Amino acid sequence: PAPDSSFLRDP
């Protein structure tokens, strides 16, 4: 599955 893209989102 695709990796968690939460790190791509701005805080």
Curated annotation (Swiss-Prot):
Keyword Transport (UniProt): no
Transmembrane domains' residue ranges: none
The entry's keywords: Neuropeptide, Secreted
GO cellular component, one term: extracellular region
Record's subcellular location: Secreted
Keyword Secreted annotated: yes
GO process terms (BP): neuropeptide signaling pathway
Its job: FMRFamides and FMRFamide-like peptides are neuropeptides.
Family the entry assigns: Belongs to the FARP (FMRF amide related peptide) family.
Protein name: Extended FMRFamide-10
Organism listed in the record: Karoophasma biedouwense
